[in-house]
């Protein structure tokens, strides 16, 4: 018989990048007594990965739990970025409600639509938390209207529209149910969660069912499956069967060796867990997302949302440049392969395939951000390799027509730059869907555009809007191929010989275009050292020194003034490279190079 488990609540937190959801979770942890009084706490405890802290985004969904008035509240932090949408869909299967965190000034942002739509489809109740209410320019009343409009647009039911609003300042650790109320602590939010979010239900007497929604990985115990106990109970040393909804023939007998529940930020070992509990299970070597752990007597898999397919791919290649092996710790194809295969343990939206070339692997993901985060992680771990230009993954329909992935781009841009943004995106086959005024002299544009039209556009976008534009994208299915797009209009400046760059050589090269290197940097023949102002590639000798004669002194070189070079970030470099180029990634450097380094060979191929 189905019963409710009143001492547990499972909730997910949804928010736009930077609206303060991770800070909110920190405060809930602090005020429920997870930390000791004198304990030093890192800001944004939940963003535990270095890149997450630097970029201020959440990439992996994380689990934590707080106890309030004897009720255990399991909180799951969801990624706000559409590139990591594969995470979101599965996480929502574990919870009974969501908290939508909205900035009191910026209002409901388009990126939240993606996650919120998934929550609406699953009929989950919503608590709206208007955060940053202490901002001087906060406009809470208007934001409430915006949120309700957004919910109506997403087809919310009457129950979902009748949602409670909580006003908070997560930074100060206070919340209230009315703007005029005095704010003391986070109690109003805790109370609202207990009152409004339903308790998980299930049948404790039925055969056990646990759907694995996320995978954690630990060097010591290997793969750890995380999921919610839907029915029955699960205990250590219990015999179970692993089955999968999309692959019903796959059945495997396993034994539960260790079982954990979440408490604060820790995993705590438990002997058994009942319905509604979110548990972590170790000891099953090849457990994967979407598997259901069942009792052997009646194994029935739980249906789950298929993981979104990748839309974009890059080749990861062993570095074969003249400087190969000088800066990295792991440089061989075996190292590269092992590391990519290890990434598959935790990242389910990723695909890795072998290619005809033994030294290259085709890696597919949900977007440029998804892959650039992987590249940056590998680089920090000491790997050295090269990557090719990102390409989209095409499909064919039943008539053999070519289909390509489409995206919806939501853009907020200052009014004076609207024209140039519309012009550039139209050239990239984007279609303007809606256009309207946003607050603060901004215009909000919505484009439907092929994914390949966005490759390499972010750099242009920031330049065109003087850094003031905001662009968010979300995958929007496949559509017929829209025709060819012309990418980079400029050619490359290519180093003519291997050596060290000299002021004299750079001075004559900078008249040709924009340089990416300064004086005293090592270069090799075939390396791209700048962007040509014209459309063709041109070789320049940046290692050329001035011939000394008895009438000229070498000190006259000091008078040559170089324009400071443009140093490309990883994203900008990925955007910049062309189809005949590679980006060499090492722990210390990013270098762009031609695939074929020998100039004579290059000319022959280009004929």
Language model regions located:
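Charge-rich, low-aromatic oligomerization/scaffolding segments with amphipathic character
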Residues: 139, 291-294, 368-384, 421-422, ...
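Conserved nucleotide-binding/hydrolysis micro-motifs of P-loop NTPases
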Residues: 19, 31, 81-82, 105-108, ...
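Interdomain boundary/hinge elements
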Residues: 41-44, 154-168, 200-211, 240, ...
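Conserved nucleotide-binding/hydrolysis modules and their immediate coupling elements
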Residues: 209-314, 324-326, 490, 499-549, ...
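P-loop NTPase switch module centered on the Walker A-proximal segment
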Residues: 1-102, 106, 146, 215-218
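Long insertion/accessory domains within large nucleic-acid-processing enzymes
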Residues: 262, 267-270, 403, 449, ...
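Canonical P-loop GTPase G-domain recognition
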Residues: 125, 135-195
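A short, contiguous, amphipathic alpha-helix enriched in charged residues
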Residues: 321-344, 559, 563
């Amino acid at each position: 018989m189905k019963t409710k488990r009143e001492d547990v609540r499972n909730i997910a937190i949804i928010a736009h990048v930077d609206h303060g959801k991770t800070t909110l979770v920190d405060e809930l942890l602090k005020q429920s007594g997870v930390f000791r009084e004198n304990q030093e706490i890192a800001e944004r405890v939940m963003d535990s990965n270095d890149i997450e802290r630097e970029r201020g985004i959440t990439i992996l969904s994380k689990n934590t739990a707080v106890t309030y008035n004897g009720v255990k509240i399991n909180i799951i932090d969801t990624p706000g970025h559409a590139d990591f949408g594969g995470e979101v869909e599965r996480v929502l299967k574990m919870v009974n409600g969501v908290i939508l965190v909205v900035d009191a000034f910026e209002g409901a942002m388009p990126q939240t639509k993606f996650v919120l739509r998934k929550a609406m489809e699953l009929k989950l109740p919503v608590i709206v938390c208007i955060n940053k209410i202490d901002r001087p320019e906060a406009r809470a009343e208007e934001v409430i209207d915006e949120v309700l409009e957004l919910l109506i647009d997403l087809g919310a039911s009457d129950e979902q529209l009748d949602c409670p609003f909580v006003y908070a300042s997560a930074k100060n650790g206070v919340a209230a149910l009315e703007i005029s109320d005095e704010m003391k602590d986070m109690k109003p939010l805790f109370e609202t969660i207990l009152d409004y979010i339903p308790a998980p239900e299930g049948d404790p007497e039925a055969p056990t069912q646990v759907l694995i929604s996320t995978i954690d990985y630990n060097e010591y115990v290997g793969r750890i499956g995380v999921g919610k106990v839907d029915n029955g109970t699960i205990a250590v040393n219990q015999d179970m069967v692993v089955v999968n909804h999309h692959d019903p023939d796959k059945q495997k007998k396993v034994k539960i060796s260790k079982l954990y529940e979440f408490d604060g930020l820790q995993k705590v070992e438990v002997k058994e867990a009942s319905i509604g509990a979110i548990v972590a299970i170790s000891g099953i070597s090849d457990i994967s997302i979407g598997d259901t752990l069942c009792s052997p007597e009646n194994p029935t898999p739980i249906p789950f949302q298929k993981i979104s397919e990748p839309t974009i791919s890059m080749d990861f290649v062993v570095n074969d440049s003249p400087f190969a092996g000088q800066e990295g710790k792991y440089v061989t194809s075996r190292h590269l392969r092992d590391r990519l295969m290890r990434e598959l343990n935790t990242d389910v939206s990723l695909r890795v395939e072998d290619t005809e070339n033994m030294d290259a692997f085709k890696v597919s993901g949900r977007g440029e951000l998804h892959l650039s985060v992987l590249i940056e992680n590998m680089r920090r771990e000491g790997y050295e390799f090269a990557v090719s230009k990102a390409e989209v993954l095409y499909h064919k329909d039943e008539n053999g027509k070519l289909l390509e992935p489409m995206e919806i781009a939501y853009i907020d841009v200052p009014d004076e730059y609207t024209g140039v943004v519309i012009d550039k995106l139209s050239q990239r086959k984007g279609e303007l869907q809606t256009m309207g005024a946003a607050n603060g002299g901004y215009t909000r544009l919505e484009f439907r555009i092929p994914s390949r039209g966005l490759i390499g556009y972010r750099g242009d976008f920031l330049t065109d809007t003087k850094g003031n534009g905001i662009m968010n994208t979300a995958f929007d299915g496949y559509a017929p191929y829209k025709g060819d797009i012309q990418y980079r209009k400029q050619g490359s400046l290519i180093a003519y010989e291997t050596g060290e760059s000299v002021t004299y050589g750079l001075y004559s090269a900078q008249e040709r275009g924009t340089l990416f290197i300064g004086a005293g940097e090592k270069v090799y023949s075939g390396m791209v050292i700048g962007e040509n102002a014209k459309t063709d590639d041109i070789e320049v000798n940046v290692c050329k020194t001035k011939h000394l004669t008895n009438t000229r002194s070498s000190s006259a070189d000091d008078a040559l003034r170089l324009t400071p070079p443009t140093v490309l970030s990883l994203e900008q470099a990925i955007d910049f490279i062309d189809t005949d180029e590679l980006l060499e990634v090492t722990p210390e450097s990013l270098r762009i190079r031609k695939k074929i380094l020998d100039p004579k060979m290059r000319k022959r191929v280009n004929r």
